[in-house]
Design a protein with these regions (language model features):
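Structured, contiguous alpha/beta core segments that scaffold functional sites
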Residues: 10-21, 28-29, 154-328
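Generic detection of long, well-ordered alpha-helical segments
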Residues: 109-116, 129-133, 284-296, 356, ...
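Short, intrinsically disordered, mixed-charge
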Residues: 128, 297-300, 368-371
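Long amphipathic alpha-helical segments
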Residues: 75-101, 105-113, 123, 256-257, ...
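Extended, helix-rich architectural segments
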Residues: 1-220
Length: 426
């Protein structure tokens, strides 16, 4: 864990306070720039991924989150697309990457090729041993729903990797002039006990004080990872590594801990991205959101209409001679013999088939946004030959070609580079 454990001594002098204040001011500007995205993400989460609906409002753990859902088409479609991309790009059952030398002359040397194959085998073993598969699936799901995923890669003790897909609500992104994300501010909460364990003797005075009072209280921490422009490249100390890693106590406005990374530890892929929008991407869930909201409203209305037909409102004479009315199964209601007054259901003239037909149209539009028909083509049919399987896979790859190209540049390539470099330092 070479890049993470070499730390500089924290200081409460004026320079570090000014640095902390400057970084927090930058965070404030990034928060303002992200406000419009948060409303959009909240809408998407409410209707398509309720378990992550914590942007403009938060709920306690275990709270019900499906109140707005009357139809689960979008939920299932998003899960299908994210699982399909997972299977195409980083399936645990296949070798999804190969290493090669940039120097073609080395590719012709058997000993060099054998060494590279050994490195590749070691990397696969580390990926399988780690939590990569569970975390990368969450990343793909974030891409499909929110348009932006954030994956953090660090070392796991002395050997191996550890991955963490971070909720986009915690992360504030900034790009370099080429449009690549090179700065991540993470604003999150952790218990005082966890903070004390993470920072040790370097913890701020507030953390040390709270540790004695209530170690289980949650506090806010800001973690900044950004390029270090003022470093001395000839030195290998943590304060001269290419990327700065700075933990800040935002309440006291002090730097708790400062270290560095040899590579950018975050992979921040975007599903689709407009050239004029900075930092964050757009998703098929955003494209389908109007249809999703309309379908939910249609389903709600259709359910109410069907309920009125199955258990219709009752028409009673205004003199109320039958009261009290018993509407339970087998209930007896008495009225005077010979009277023409009757207890009758109200005929509402509902047209449920039309409502169901319109719902199917919206479902088809949602499925089209998530490529459901193309991804499920041939599923449940007769057994396919190996050639047919390859042909179907290639068809899916062509369908998602533009998206997969962006993921290769923003996710897979930096991921492999980061993991390879971690192994070379161990």
């Amino acid at each position: 864990m070479a890049e993470e454990i070499i730390d500089v001594e924290p200081s409460l002098n004026e320079d570090t306070k000014k640095t902390a204040t400057k970084l927090l001011d930058r965070l404030a500007s990034l928060e303002v720039a992200r406000e419009s995205w948060e409303e959009h993400w909240q809408d998407v989460a409410d209707y398509i991924v309720p378990r992550k609906a914590d942007f403009t409002r938060t709920r306690s753990a275990g709270d019900k989150r499906m109140e707005k859902i009357y139809d689960g088409t979008a939920i299932h479609a998003s899960e299908l697309l994210s699982a399909s991309i997972h299977g195409m790009l980083t399936s645990a059952s296949t070798n999804w990457f190969n290493l090669c030398f940039m120097n073609n002359d080395l590719q012709a040397i058997d000993e060099a090729k054998e060494w590279l194959e050994g490195v590749e085998h070691t990397m696969y073993a580390q990926f399988h041993r780690s939590n990569f598969q569970e975390q990368i699936h969450e990343l793909y799901h974030d891409l499909i729903t929110f348009g932006t995923g954030v994956l953090y890669v660090e070392t796991d003790g002395e050997n191996g990797f550890r991955f963490e897909t971070r909720h986009i609500s915690e992360c504030f992104l900034a790009e370099d002039p080429e449009g690549r994300v090179d700065t991540v501010y993470r604003k999150y909460k952790m218990s005082v006990r966890s903070a004390q364990k993470l920072f040790g003797e370097e913890a701020s005075s507030r953390i040390n004080k709270l540790m004695k009072q209530d170690p289980h209280e949650e506090i806010e921490i800001v973690h900044v990872v950004m390029p270090r422009d003022d470093r001395d490249a000839e030195k290998i100390s943590s304060e001269n590594k290419p990327y700065a890693s700075i933990y800040i106590d935002p309440e006291e406005k002090v730097i708790i801990k400062e270290s560095g990374f040899d590579e950018f530890p975050y992979m921040c892929p975007r599903y689709l991205k407009a050239s004029f929008e900075r930092g964050y991407g757009r998703s098929p869930a955003m494209q389908a959101l109007p249809d999703v909201k309309m379908l939910n409203k249609m389903s709600e209305v259709t359910i109410r209409s069907a309920e009125k037909q199955v258990d219709p409102p009752l028409m009673l004479p205004d003199d109320g001679f039958m009261l009290p009315i018993r509407t339970v199964p087998g209930g007896l209601n008495f009225y005077r013999s010979g009277t023409r007054d009757r207890l009758e259901p109200l005929q509402i003239g509902a047209n449920n088939p039309l409502g169901l037909q319109m719902e199917d149209q919206r479902r088809q539009a949602i499925n089209s946004a998530f490529y459901v028909d193309q991804l499920t083509m041939g599923v449940g049919g007769p057994m396919m030959t190996a050639t047919e399987v390859v042909a179907r896979t290639e068809e899916k790859m062509r369908l998602l070609g533009p998206v997969l190209g962006r993921l290769q540049a923003e996710l897979l390539q930096p991921l492999i580079n980061r993991c390879y470099n971690i192994l070379t330092r161990q």
